[in-house]
Amino acid sequence: MSIQGQIALALMVNMAVGSVDASQEVMKNLSLNFGKALDECKKEMTLTDAINEDFYNFWKEGYEIKNRETGCAIMCLSTKLNMLDPEGNLHHGNAMEFAKKHGADETMAQQLIDIVHGCEKSTPANDDKCIWTLGVATCFKAEIHKLNWAPSMDVAVGEILAEV
């Protein structure tokens, strides 16, 4: 491979890695801002502190969230952010606005919406909306990991603690 080819390859790899890092940063910002009303939702829905561990470990690969209350909290947070339509599905316009407000460009925001929409379709129907929401969140997490967009929660937790 010529020197020019090697330089071009190095630049493409650097841009791809930079893109992943930027996506992880956006996902961290989205996660931090999404969870800001968690205490409010916990009080309103009388949710236990057991969900704190699920939110702390949410992005850890291999961590399974099984607590129904965590699904209820995610549903509550989504509602507070006006990201759900009257049927409880993702409101695409509001979700797009939220993603872009917290650092996603148009392409990434659309990809996030497409992922959630796909997860909504693939998650089995359940009369218990909390369980269904938990299924959608689990699917979303898996898809974000496939893209290598999951944020490093060590950094995110450090930022949360710095705000306290």
From Swiss-Prot:
Taxonomy of the source species: Eukaryota, Metazoa, Ecdysozoa, Arthropoda, Hexapoda
Entry function: This major soluble protein in olfactory sensilla of male moths serves to solubilize the extremely hydrophobic pheromone molecules such as bombykol and to transport pheromone through the aqueous lymph to receptors located on olfactory cilia.
InterPro entries: Odorant/phero-bd_Lep (IPR006072), PBP/GOBP (IPR006170), PBP_GOBP_sf (IPR036728)
Subunit comment: Homodimer.
Name of the molecule in the record: Pheromone-binding protein
Cysteine disulfide partners in this protein: C41-C76, C72-C130, C119-C139
Expression sites by tissue: Antenna.
Pfam families linked: PBP_GOBP
Chain segments annotated as transmembrane: none
SUPFAM superfamilies xrefs: Insect pheromone/odorant-binding proteins
Signal peptide: 1-22
Gene3D superfamilies with a match to the protein in the record: Pheromone/general odorant binding protein domain (1.10.238.20)
Keyword RNA-binding: no
Coiled coil feature spans: none
Keywords: Disulfide bond, Pheromone response, Pheromone-binding, Signal, Transport
Gene Ontology MF annotations: pheromone binding
Superkingdom assignment: Eukaryota
GO biological process, one term: response to pheromone
Similarity field: Belongs to the PBP/GOBP family.
